[in-house]
Amino acid sequence: MVFEGLSDKLQNTLSKLTGKGKLTEKDIDAAMREVKLALLEADVNFKVVKNFVKGVKERALGKDVLESLTPGQQVIKIVNEELTNLMGTNEVKIDFSKKPTIIMMCGLQGAGKTTTSGKIANKLKKDGKRPLLVACDVYRPAAIKQLQVVGESVDTPVFTMGDKISPVDISKAALEHAKKNGNDVVIIDTAGRLHVDENLMEELQNINKEVDPSEILLVLDAMTGQDAVNVAESFDKSLKLTGVVLTKLDGDARGGAALSIRAVTDVPIKYIASGEKMDNIEVFHPDRMASRILGMGDVLSLIEKAQSAVDEEKAKELEEKLRKSTFTFEDFLDQMQQMKNMGPLEDLLGMIPGVNSKALKGINLSENEFAKVEAIILSMTKKERIKPEIIDSSRRKRIAEGSGTSPSEVNKLIKQFKDMRKMMKQFGNMSKKMGKKRFKMPFPF
């Protein structure tokens, strides 16, 4: 879960305040000391932490808070607002005013630049754009091949001229190619280095002068913490960045980069990415991220993920089947696939208000559990999936052997499935009687 350590500490500290009827200056001082320590441990820039704590404390000591009937909730509201301000207040969108829109991707080696280029292409393609990926890393062995593989995985063309032509000339030729072939977005994957150096910056500056990109996005590894902010400062000084993409937010990222970059460089975070799957990228919303960190959920992002993963026609069919109790294991398997497309279950549950990382630790969210359920269903015959009532003890034994599980695990899944089907039928009938629009669930559990 994103920023798990920081999130736990902030939530624990602020929960102490909500348990008190009245707050004193001493209470707020103690809480702010803990908040300060939590932010520093998350590798947030020291000056940023100092200003943040000062701003929260000044507002928290105001008359409106101290005399409020719910002062603890008021302080949480202030922390939420200040966290949002720290990360940029509002989302900053990609500038598509120029045709074609040129996005120059830059960053150090290992940050995930090539994969991120593919993820952005994939996202823009889903938004109705016609992106072109451009291979300008002519130095790293197999870099061009890697981009071609990425492009193929997201069904996006890759422009390449091999590794003997200069990146500047490749960029110019790619722009002409895009104009002739109707590509409205050109994503230039430039070369990275192990560290910031003059040659890297000079090459990027030359590409910038020649093709005049609408966006210069710096890809940063969130796990590098404060170093990421230093890298952002160096690149911004030479190139005037328009945005940052933070990657590897599913790792042990402590959150320092996300909470420091905007405040230190004034460069907005435009996307955040996690994992290797091409769908694992989302537009960065400072207000939603602040809410996630404080355990207040992110319902809007959850809805957006569900809408992008769910087939509308299938959702209508599913709703009818659930109401009539004709929902089968075939449908269940289909819903599992759609849910997997929404991203890791732990991340999805983390977007629900009130579900914090401590609560998630008590739940088995292993991908292996999904795989086990999938294996059991796939080991059934088509007839068994449609009519689970016919699955007797000998069939259960065969299914267990075919899926590498035990008969008791097969029994458990069938029982849970039948219980769920009954419950969903009752839910569907109840909502129909109430005459309200039924909730279209993206998955059946």
Predicted feature locations:
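G-domain G4 guanine-recognition motif of GTPases
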Residues: 45, 109, 134-139, 161-163, ...
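Short, glycine/polar-rich helix-capping loops at beta-to-alpha or helix-loop-helix junctions
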Residues: 141-147, 228, 256
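Conserved phosphate-handling catalytic cores of large alpha/beta enzymes
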Residues: 171-174, 179, 183, 195, ...
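Long amphipathic alpha-helical segments used for membrane anchoring, targeting, substrate engagement
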Residues: 3-20, 288-445
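Short, surface-exposed connector motifs at secondary-structure boundaries
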Residues: 127-132, 154-158, 184-186, 211-216, ...
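Primarily NTPase-proximal linker/entry elements flanking Walker-type ATP/GTP-binding cores
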Residues: 6, 10-136, 143-163, 167-190
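Residue-level signature of catalytic and energy-coupling elements of molecular machines
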Residues: 17, 43, 79, 108, ...
